[in-house]
Curated annotation (Swiss-Prot):
Composition skew (Low complexity), residue ranges: 190-202, 270-305
Miscellaneous comment text of the record: Less stable in procambial than in phloem pole cells.
Induction: Strong accumulation in developing sieve elements upon CLE45 peptide application in a BAM3-dependent manner.
InterPro entries according to UniProt: MAKR2/5
UniProt key word Cytoplasm: yes
Keyword Cytoplasm set for record: yes
Identification of the protein by name: Membrane-associated kinase regulator 5
Subcellular localization, as worded in the UniProt entry: Cell membrane; Cytoplasm, Cytosol
Region (Disordered): 188-239, 267-326
Gene: MAKR5
Length: 326
């Protein structure tokens, strides 16, 4: 009984909004008539005690079904038989037993978790998201326009710079040629006049001029005169003749290179021959010096031998004279 009352108290405290489950407990005693008729049943009353449970499971039903269940209460009877006899139950729903635990007050109830959001917050969040989307679209469009305009500006600037460079190059080249042309004409006129007046000039004056100019300057003047005459001749000739002359110049350069190689090869051979001849002459000189030394030594040796012989002969003559005198 105490356990069932505790369950009732626990269920009422746990359920806040839902209707609480009703647990009704009733005990009935056996009628005195049955006890008087059968003495064996009196002994079994304490052992075969029974109780009645009335439970309304409103938590697992819809609200309409809950209302129906509250209006119509079903009574379930449990019968316990002993010696094939049925004992009736007595309904004590009108007089529920009061337990000391029902007097206790339930503690304060707190809502620990709130998963639901208010409708106002959801509407405000939706409006914010829409505003953000519109602002992002506007920003992207502006960026695209700025990039296209900047690209066009850079392309136009590059084109203008290219045109300015080409115009600058053309203007500079024209100015350069306009400045060089009179100088070139003057130099050509001077060269032509000098070539015309040079044959009429007297040889004495030429010799004086040559005597006054050093030899190095003369060679430089000759080379410059040749190059100028060649350039002047090329300037007045047709392109076909120029090509022919360029080919001839290339051939002359090739032939001169071949001749130079031959000369260097022959020069190396001549140098080797000269080195050989010098080595042979040096060896001959060494041999001659050695032979002269040998002849000198031989003459010396011979003179020494002759002197020794003469000394021996003199000593022998002296000995003979001494013997004769004795």
């Amino acid at each position: 009984m105490e356990a069932l009352t505790f369950m009732k108290f626990w269920l009422t405290n746990n359920t806040t909004i839902k209707p609480r489950r009703e647990i009704r407990i009733s005990e009935s005693a056996v009628d005195s008539t049955t006890g008087s008729e059968d003495p064996d049943l009196d002994l079994c009353e304490g052992e075969d005690s029974f109780f009645e449970l009335k439970i309304s499971l409103s938590d697992f039903k819809t609200p309409k079904e809950k209302q129906r269940l509250e209006t119509t209460t079903t009574t379930t009877t449990y019968s316990v038989s002993n010696k094939s006899k049925v004992l009736p139950f007595v309904d004590i729903s009108s007089k529920p037993q009061q337990s000391p635990t029902t007097l206790l007050k339930s503690g304060q109830k707190f809502r620990a978790f709130s998963f639901k959001k208010s409708e106002k917050s959801t509407t405000t969040e939706k409006k914010k998201e829409e505003n953000n989307r519109t602002s992002l679209n506007v920003r992207f469009r502006v960026d695209d326009e700025t990039t296209t305009t900047s690209f066009r500006k850079t392309a136009s600037i590059a084109r203008s710079q290219q045109t300015d460079d080409t115009m600058f190059d053309d203007s500079v080249s024209k100015r350069f040629f306009s400045l060089i042309k009179p100088l070139y004409t003057k130099s050509t006129k001077k060269q032509s006049s000098s070539t015309i007046t040079s044959p009429t000039s007297s040889p004495a004056t030429r010799e004086k001029q040559r005597s006054n100019i050093p030899s190095g300057m003369r060679s430089v003047r000759r080379q410059l005169g040749k190059s100028r005459s060649a350039s002047a001749a090329i300037g007045g000739m047709s392109p076909a003749n120029r090509i022919d002359e360029s080919l001839q110049v290339q051939q002359d350069g090739i032939q001169s290179a071949i001749l130079h190689c031959k000369k260097s090869f022959h020069g190396s051979r001549e140098s080797s021959l000269l080195s050989r001849s010098t080595s042979e002459s040096s060896s001959q000189e060494k041999l001659s010096t050695s032979s002269s030394e040998d002849s000198y030594l031989f003459s010396r040796i011979s003179s020494d031998s002759i002197s020794e012989k003469s000394m021996d002969s003199l000593t022998s003559i002296k000995e003979q004279r001494e013997k004769i005198s004795d």
